[in-house]
Amino acid sequence: RSCYGKRSWLAGCDVSNAFFCFPCLLFQSVGTEVLWTTTGVRDLKHLSEKCKRHESSRSHLDNSMKLTFFGRVSIAEQLDEGYRIGIRRHNEEVTKHRHILSTIIDRVKFCGAFELALRGHDESESSDNPGMFRGWVDFAASLDGALKEHLDRATVFKGTSKTIQNELLDCMLSVTREQIIKEVQTSDFLSIQADETTDIATQPQLLLVLRYIDAKNNVQERFFEFIPLQSATAESVATALKGRLATVLPEDQKSKLICQAYDGATTSAVQRKIQDVYPNAHYIHCYAHQLNLIMQQATSHISKVRIFFSNIGGFSSFFSKSPKRTCFLDEVVAHRLPRSGTVRWNFHSRAISTVFEHRDDLIRCFESIQDSGDFDPNTVREAGALAMLLEDQDFKFFLELYHHITPHVDFLCAKLQEKNIDSVHIKGSIRQFQQEIQKIRNSLHSIGEQSSGSRPTKRRRALSPEDRERIAAEVCDTILGHTRERFSFADHLVCATLLQGDRFEEYKDTFPEDALSSTMKAYPMLSGSKLKTELSLIYSKEEFKACRGAVDLFQLFMENNLEEVFSETVTLLKVVITTPMTTAEAERCFSTSKRIKTFLRNPVTQERLNALAMLSMEKRLVTEMTDFNQRVIEKFAGQNERRATFMFK
């Protein structure tokens, strides 16, 4: 490799096991040595001496010059004064155009980073409200004479049209993705998070987030893409995912993918299809996915359940729109319970429990709103609909059913976040959860009796008690099956306990053999004997007991160049940090998927959604890429036949 680095003309042949001269092979001018074009040099002992003699020969210099000027303007033309002046003027024009384009790129970046609308309703010259982007460009022109002159006089390329904006957004997205792929391919491990969402046209799409440790030893969760889906089936999701992963990980890096996490209802079939191609990609429950919402999604294939959750969301919507409505509800409760403190209404994360526990208060509140005469017609109409809903037998049945189920889901989630966790603890918590759900399933008849005891409403035909029990049994069975699939692999939680500083004192006396065994089973790329030796040394040192978590320990090793000394521990730390597992360690929890879902709630256009989301979510990455604008310009200039010139000669 050092020979090739020193001499760019040197070429090797693995068939003849000899060295040749590439320029001489191509052109073979008069006097070219046969040794370097036909026979080849095999004498490694005297290779350096032969190379020095050959590169000093006239024929080699002639051939090298021919290769250099191959496909270029002739030497005579390049030496012509008129040609030189033309080149200089062309490059001056390119410099000017690149400056203008870079200024426009900066404005697009700003609007994207702060989620501002690029375009207004009227972007004509005389418009008083041309939009944020055009306004920024006009403001920049007032400070930049070159930009102002360009906007006033340009006829070929102005840079402010919708077409140019879209092309720039595409180029910016491409450059940022290329950077993310480069970071992933230089990292040791990769995890993916894929969440099912829908766009404003209700078309299914997949949100893909990549998690890895970058070259600066910082854990990153990067937005990568909204992948459009043909349908929300497992086959469609798996096909789309495998297609994107193939662009991120080449064939020889498939073992890097160590984790996959999903929040949709088709996860079990998807994860098996992905693991067929990426065998190390364990399916886990991700900290970014709320377990209660996942259980809701898992049962949403049942139409009655889907209707119930749509209805329960109506209470949150009703009270979040107006503080006046919430105050009125407080007054109703205060009148009934004058000595009680203020109730903390939570119609979001605890909507089911809140509605179940205060059902009578809510009915009284809605009826009072209808009778008071102090509310607008929309409020009165919505209050009447919600009051009828609270009297509906089917709604009451599912309200009570999920009121019994959700506390156990919350309890399981809390247990899995505890620090003092082991395989026995995990299996015990999951077994206890399954037993509680089974108890609810076995007592469905009592739930049905309570909900059917009240007067029926005339809204629509209610389900029979038998139908309710059948649907509730299906709900319980679905939750039990989903729990088995989601937590079938939990060794990642166990292996994380090997690196908890507050347990090092305990491990010093009794080494955690079971946890090590589970770790080796889950991640066979580790060397068990060396890992045990390294961990034993870490546990015995007082200095390491101040470690607050895996990220702290990893940073300590990397900052002090200990990655070779503690090679297996560092590898384990990379696995643990890259895996988006449920943990109390804040440094490992910064949900990109939640930020993206918040971004989707903003009034953002679907056109160029991927590019706008990338500029918003990855604005720090874009800022850190010092050559970002130049890379965008190069890509923009090479896309089409541009009438304006952007490439130097």
Feature annotation, model-predicted:
Residues 1-649:
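Alpha-helical structural modules in large enzymes and assemblies
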